[in-house]
């Protein structure tokens, strides 16, 4: 457990590694502010909808995340599981470029980030870039659909098949292409 830190998130990632080691094919770890009544990534600085602030990010959440995620990746690598395990850490949107009156940041769907590791992907690859304030993508915007297509393709599912609607229109099963930049 020391490798993952002492946080709830670290304990959940350790359990995830144990599940993967036992053959589980997909594990999801979610952190919401209702989880164990503690601060999480919902950073509005408002006790009614997301109590965390940027100071909580700096002092607690980011160090816990860094320790736990790096512990998971190191542990998977030491056990020979990292090449066969795809780890994705992301939220469903970004955060406003400007701090609100409560020292938090609100929802911002136009610009977001994520981490994809393991799975025989090229390490250190960066796909896309934002402007200096993380307001807008300025190079190679990535959509959540592309991340979904990447996960599905990595799992060996063909993302090209078409589905037929009631009116006989053929639509792609997943209308996005995988992030091929992640494979060297």
Predicted feature residues:
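Ligand-binding pockets and gating/stacking loops
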Residues: 1-184
């Amino acid at each position: 457990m020391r490798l993952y830190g002492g946080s709830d998130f670290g304990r959940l990632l350790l359990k995830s590694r144990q599940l993967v080691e036992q053959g589980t094919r997909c594990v999801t770890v979610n952190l919401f502010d209702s989880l164990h009544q503690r601060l999480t990534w919902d950073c509005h600085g408002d006790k009614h909808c997301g109590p965390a602030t940027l100071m909580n990010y700096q002092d607690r959440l980011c160090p816990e995340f860094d320790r736990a995620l790096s512990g998971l990746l190191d542990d998977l690598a030491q056990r020979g599981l990292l090449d066969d395990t795809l780890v994705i850490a992301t939220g469903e949107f970004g955060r406003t470029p400007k701090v609100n009156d409560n020292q938090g940041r609100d929802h911002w769907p136009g610009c977001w980030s994520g981490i994809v590791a393991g799975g025989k992907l090229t390490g250190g690859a960066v796909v896309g870039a934002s402007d200096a304030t993380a307001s807008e993508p300025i190079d190679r915007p990535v959509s959540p659909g592309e991340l979904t297509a990447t996960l599905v393709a990595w799992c060996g599912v063909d993302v090209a098949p078409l589905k037929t609607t009631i009116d006989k229109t053929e639509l792609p099963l997943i209308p996005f292409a995988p992030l091929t930049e992640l494979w060297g």
